């Protein structure tokens, strides 16, 4: 049951990366309190929900920039208010253990339906 709920949340996040997503919105969709949702999400994914959303936005933005899109347009599309805000989020990056955990979740196919 929890796996399906978390997968639905991850799918929703992935489909709405260019929109504002709040933790309250996600926990309401999942039917859990904010506290319980935070715990479930962190256990399933290995990082807090808002940090996960930021990482996914960064990865998508980097991909689009690599495809020739203008950096400022991509940054704004993914909710970064300024070029500087995007750069700061990009430079900060995930800690090594979070990179390993995120890659592990991705390798198991848990995050993406379409294997993206």
What are these regions (language model features)?
Residues 7-24, 43-78, 103-115:
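Terminal helix-turn-helix DNA-binding modules in bacterial transcription factors
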Residues 30, 78-79:
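Core residues of bacterial helix-turn-helix
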Residues 2, 88-116:
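…primarily DNA-binding HTH/wHTH and HhH modules…
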């Amino acid at each position: 049951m929890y796996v399906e709920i978390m997968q639905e949340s991850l799918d929703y996040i992935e489909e709405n990366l260019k929109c504002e997503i709040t933790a309250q919105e996600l926990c309401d969709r999942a039917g859990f309190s904010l506290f319980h949702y935070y715990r479930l999400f962190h256990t399933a994914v290995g990082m807090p929900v808002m940090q996960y959303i930021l990482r996914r936005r960064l990865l998508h933005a980097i991909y689009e920039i690599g495809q020739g899109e203008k950096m400022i347009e991509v940054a704004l599309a993914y909710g970064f208010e300024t070029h500087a805000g995007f750069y700061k989020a990009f430079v900060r990056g995930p800690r090594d253990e979070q990179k390993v955990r995120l890659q592990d979740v991705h390798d198991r196919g848990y995050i993406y339906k379409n294997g993206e």
